[in-house]
Amino acid sequence: MKLNKLNQKHQFEWFVGFAEGDGSWQTDNSNRSIFIINQQNPQILYKIKKLVGYGQINGPYENKNGSTYYRYRVGNLKGTKRLIEIFNGNLVLDKTQKRFENYLKVYNTQVSTKEIPLSEKRHIPTLNDHWLSGFIDAEGSFSGIIQKDP
């Protein structure tokens, strides 16, 4: 099944929000850009891999608490370029924007083609896009308290 353009746009908005909640923009010892998401549910990672078109999923791993998790990782140049196209100008949080800037800078030192400039545009989420649902899927929780009337 092919994604229609509107549905695909929503999926990318969701992915950016999810990545801002659970993603990690890193550089390794070889000065390469690497993007990682760790998740207990591997099915989410497979959906992300299909959406992006790049990456590897490894695991299961066990953390210090004994919980099992899986890892989505993109470290090759083609996959990194694709992620840059998705994230550049679409991030919301200052902390992820700063990490992304370094990620982009390192990528630009790796390629011999024209550098990709950092977009000055910033995404402002609304209730009509899917960034917030992605971020909540990564970081959110809801709770309620039922109290008896006095």
How should each PLM-predicted stretch be described?
Residues M1-P150:
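Internal intein/HINT superfamily modules and their associated LAGLIDADG
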